[in-house]
Structure formats: structure tokens, C-alpha cells
Amino acid sequence: MSWRGRSTYYWPRPRPYVQPPEMIGPMRPEQFSDEVEPATPEEGEPATQRQDPAAAQEGEDEGASAGQGPKPEADSQEQGHPQTGCECEDGPDGQEMDPPNPEEVKTPEEGEKQSQC
């Protein structure tokens, strides 16, 4: 007869359901007074310069890319699907290929170096 110790696995206990807090209304910026900038600009400073610096950089980037013209569609496809140098029929379609059988693949010593496709 063998001794059985107490199981270390315990079933997860069901968590009591907690109702989410009720929505009172839309959140207003006054609730977060620490994060909100004052509505009136300081003296001597135009209101247009009070924008977020990150937003200003994005605007500059958009202007630079608009001046260069639209990028060719082929470039965007290459970024989405990097080429591996082994272009097979099933690859770009999204179908996965099975790995090659090691018995069928010749080593470089046995024959010429060939593509595994």
C-alpha cells in the first residue's frame, strides 16, 4: 500500500460577481484638474503655441511625407510580408507550409546546393 499525499492542485474558486459602478455621466475635465492646462493662454504667448509638442511633430511629419508624394504600394507590401529568399507558391497566400522531411532533403555534401521549395 502506498501513501497518497494531499493533492497540490486546487480547483479555482468561483469569484463573487461584483457589479460595475454606475455611469453617472460623461467625464468632465474639471474632475482631473491636475492634468488639464488652463483654458486662457498666458500673456505674450499666442494660443496656437500651447499645443502638445508631440502633436506638432506629427504635423511636421505629415507635411514632409505629403511633399514627397505617395509611396508605391509595393513598398508597403514588402514591409508587411518580408521576403525570405525562398518564394514558394503557397507562401504569399497565407497558407502555411509543412517543414521539409529530413530524409528527403539532400545535404550539400550529397548533391548540389538546391532550394528546399
UniProtKB/Swiss-Prot annotation:
This is G antigen 12J. This gene belongs to a multigene family expressed in a large variety of tumors whereas in normal tissues, expression is restricted to germ cells. These genes organized in clustered repeats, have a high degree of predicted sequence identity, but differ by scattered single nucleotide substitution. Their sequences contain either the antigenic peptide YYWPRPRRY or YRPRPRRY which is recognized by cytotoxic T-cells. It comes from the Eukaryota. Belongs to the GAGE family. Residues 1-117 are annotated as: Disordered. Residues 103-117 have a biased composition (Basic and acidic residues). Residues 32-45, 87-96 have a biased composition (Acidic residues). Pfam families: GAGE.
